[in-house]
Amino acid sequence: MKLKELEKPAVQAWSPARQYPVYLATGTSAQQLDASFSTNATLEIFEIDFRDPSLDLKHKGILSVSSRFHKLIWGSFGSGLLENSGVIAGGGDNGTLTLYNVTHVLSSGKEPLIAQKQKHTGAVRALDFNPFQGNLLASGASDSEIFIWDLNHLSVPMTPGPKSQNPPEDIKALSWNLQVQHILASAHPSGKAVVWDLRKNEPIIKVSSHSSRMNCSGLAWNPDIATQLVLCSEDDQLPVIQLWDLRFASSPLKVLESHSRGILSMSWNQADAELLLSTAKDSQIFCWNLSSSEVVYKLPTQSSWCFDVQWCPQSPPVFSAVSFDGWISLCSVMGRSWEAQHMRQADKVPEQVAQASLIPPLKKPPKWMRRPAGGSFAFGGKLVTFGLPSIPVQPVAQACSRPVFISQVITESEVLTRSVVLQEALGSGNLLNYCQSKVQQASLPCEKILWQFLKVTLEQDSRPKFLGLLGYSREELQKKVDTCLKSDSKSQESPQLEAVDLKSDRAHSPCAQASKHTAKEASESSAFFDELIPQNMTPWEIPTTEDTDGLLSQALLLGELRSAVELCLKEERFADAIILAQAGDAELLKWTQERYLAKRRTKTSSLLACVVKKNWKDLVCACRLKNWREALALLLTYSGPEKFPELCDMLGTRMEQEGGRALTSEARLCYVCSGSVERLVESWAKFQQASSPMALQELMEQVTVLSRSLELLQGSNKMSPGPATTHRLTQYANLLAAQGSLATAMSFLPSDCIQPGVQQLRDRLFHAQGSAVLGQQAPAFPFPRVAVGAALHSKETSSYRRGLQPPQQVPAPSVRPRTTAQPSSVMPFSPSQPSPSQGSSDHRVLRPQAILPGHFVPGVRPALSPPQLSGGQSVPAVNPAGFCGAWPLPGPTPVMASPDFMQPGSTHLPETPRLLPLPPVGPPGPNPLSSQLPASPVTFSVAPPPGGPRAPCSSALPSSGILATCPGPQDSWKVSPASQGNLQRKKLPETFMPPAPITAPLRSLGPEPQQALLPQPLVSSATLPPPGAPRECSLQQLQPLPPERTEKELPPEHQCVKDSFEALLQRCSLTATDLKTKRKLEEAARRLECLYEKLCEGTLSPHVLAGLHEVARCVDAGSFEQGLAVHAQVAGCSSFSEVSSFMPMLKAVLTIAHKLQG
């Protein structure tokens, strides 16, 4: 495809590969003259912008020079500097070698001329810069002169050695070796190539052809193999390209022969060593594949010869070609056709231009499109990589193994280490030490207290330990209480001593002495005196006044304890009220406590109320959040095991909602106490804004320990994780799987979770472990199993059965013209009964229905044997002329029978038939199956229209045995012209026996279009039977007409087969020239329609389908020999009746394509 063009008679040179943007330098050619015959010479530089769709080049710099150029080359010497774009060297007449500074040419500033030397004796036609040392320039001219110039010291050039040619001759080409920097090769018109070693300063090998007509016009080294070079011949009698290997220099390694005239120039692609570009006097530009020795790209120039072609160093698919008519064209081997492009000179040609031919791109993808390396991540943290082999390049292309490496990528090594430690602790059951180590490793106070709580969950009698972690210990409290009581006892010590003294004085008093003496005497005399009240007690008074005390006394006297308690509460005598309430029942005591707590407002009254009432929900909801520790301690002390988890969750939720982020981490302690794993995970998600692998690992450790403690507490009753926990477990399992720890990841997945994502991950983890899970039961398949083939068959069967449902009443059709058939004789035929179809499960009884009005029976066909097509299928017979009608003729025709011979329950309908034969027609009798029709015309009696008299009429089959369709705008059946010809030539035998009923679907036929209703000549009255005469047979419609069958679409998985074959037929039709081949291709296109219909119906076996797909792939790849081999294998292993309708034609198409390709 042409990209750019420039009208200028010049030689060319591309900018070096590291130069950006891309430039093209042109110098006025010494071998050409323009239309003006100007003798001026210029050096110009153009910028190449491939994004610009126009064909023009951007002019960037121009310099007038003194002489024209035979050769132009652009080197990278000094291009490492930002202000330097390299050096252009030009070879001219009289041995002139000129060097230019590209930067100065582009800027038009300083003098761009670096140096001009005239050491050579003739025209300088060969130049090349050393690819390793940019300061070394090789030049060649007449008289076998070769100089090596050092751009740093241009005064005296060096020679690679003594002149090797005798007699001396011109140097046509020079080329430095692209692998070894001190090797230089030169080409000579005599057909020899000399390889020079600059270290030895002598030629080391000479390559020459055995043919004396070899005239070397070009030379190039292999970019990859240091010992290979190519030579091209300018001789018209030997236009060849020779590939030489210096290790086998006795003869060329390959000889490329496709040009018809001498080769003028060639260029070896630096990005793909298999591609070699050549141009010759035959006005052809060829791109060769040196591995296969074939031309992979052709570009006719359609003008004069191109004497120079060069690959673009920066863009591998682009090359430039310079022609003798003064045009420089920039083309690409990746395009379709440069002739399809709009060219500037198209309007200049007045005569008719021939149609442009399609020029295909490269047949094989070039090397620069091949990925040198690639990789892809796989499940389980696997990295699959590939790269180019490190083995040295072979002289001849050979199949080499390309290794694929599978590596395990671990990005979270600390997560894996901690996961292993956790698994070891779980396996050994030593979680207490694990928790203790986590407490010691915790850096934050909140994390430390959390792990302490988690450790307590694993211990016995955990509530007191929780209280201790909250800062409340029974031992410490007892010590504080004892200290407080001791201080109170010291302050009350003096009053107690005075009381003892009073007792002592009273004991020594005379009254006391007398009393003690009297009591002693009384005990001796009688026990009665032991019960006497001591005389020294002070009597107390029971008040009966109207004040509070009197009312209280009266209430107590009457046993009204409630009233007494109310009086005490009124006077705020709370102790008296409580004491009196205890003397009553429990209800009175509770009521008294409530009244007391309602009246008494102290700092501890709310706490006392909660303790007394045991209303912990109010405590959780009403306490201040700064006292969350005290609230949790109360729950731990007083709450029962039934309400305790719920109350702890309520407290933690309130702390999260009202306490903000400060209390969110503390709320997790409440969830640990309650054993709520789900709430713990939800709280972590709120507290941890951005989840990291390490944070997720920490959470999983906490969840695992808490879950294990619950298992120990509840025994075997394992609770299912909630949605949040399941999500984090799945996330953690994915993290472990990504690090390659598949077994551990699978152990963390909930076993009873039915979420699709979890089930799919479990199934994936199980199968990813490979042999590690041998002997274990595989998890359930995570996807619903769908039997595609069975579902499609069931769908077709159900739709057909719905079409056979007999309606309760047949609607009367619209009025249409009466048609009758001409009477004629018909050959007798034997009636036959449809045989039951295998596999059918739908047994129906056909009941007689009302006969349709009119002199025709729609949908009825005689049971005539249709002509056989290839593949064992048959084309159904078309309607006789006597049965033309405007009603549509659907594919699956219902069974029509006379009530004389059709018995209820005797018909077994096939499952999915396309056509059913006509039921036996004959005179009524006891055994209609054995009766035959006479040779006289067969008559059919039909019912008159509703409301009209029964007027019998007869219609007969046509006398001719030719099966003809009714004339109309459309045929009744969609058959090919060849099949129609067979139908018309098919004659019925003299004694015709109907075949067995057709129970298999006819796949090659489309839906029947509606026939046009055409009138037929009326039958004379002599042929009509008299009124009342017995009718020979009566046709009654027993089933309604099913809906017209719609043509099925080709399944998407088989669309590629049809596309490949149709594209192949189109290409062959365009390429074929003889009439016989074109006709054969047209016939093949018709025959392949049978294949496409079989693909639509799904009747081909998997073996045949696989073979067709493989043939299609071979067709797409252009490998027709391989396609014929696959075709032969499929045809040999398949049933003849299955593939005979399309396989022969497919082979014929492949054979034609193979011949056209050759």
Curated annotation (Swiss-Prot):
WD repeats lie at residues 4-47, 65-110, 119-159, 166-206, 209-254, 258-298, 301-341, 376-407. Monoubiquitinated by the BCR(KLHL12) E3 ubiquitin ligase complex, leading to regulate the size of COPII coats. Transmembrane segments: none annotated. One of its GO terms (biological process) is endoplasmic reticulum to Golgi vesicle-mediated transport. Signal peptide: none annotated. GO terms for cellular component: endoplasmic reticulum membrane; ER to Golgi transport vesicle membrane; vesicle coat. Pfam families: WD40 (PF00400). Residues 485-520, 797-843, 968-1010 are annotated as: Disordered. It comes from the Eukaryota. Keywords: Cytoplasm, Cytoplasmic vesicle, Endoplasmic reticulum, ER-Golgi transport, Membrane, Protein transport, Repeat, Transport, Ubl conjugation, WD repeat. Residues 822-840 have a biased composition (Low complexity). Disulfide bonds: none annotated. It is a peripheral membrane protein. Its main location: cytoplasm. It is found in: Cytoplasm; Cytoplasmic vesicle, COPII-coated vesicle membrane; Endoplasmic reticulum membrane. The keyword Transferase does not apply. InterPro entries: SEC31-like, WD40/YVTN_repeat-like_dom_sf, WD40_repeat_CS, WD40_repeat_dom_sf, WD40_rpt. COPII is composed of at least 5 proteins: the SEC23/24 complex, the SEC13/31 complex and SAR1. SEC13 and SEC31 make a 2:2 tetramer that forms the edge element of the COPII outer coat. The tetramer self-assembles in multiple copies to form the complete polyhedral cage. Interacts (via WD 8) with SEC13. Interacts with SEC31A. As a component of the coat protein complex II (COPII), may function in vesicle budding and cargo export from the endoplasmic reticulum. Belongs to the WD repeat SEC31 family. This is Protein transport protein Sec31B.
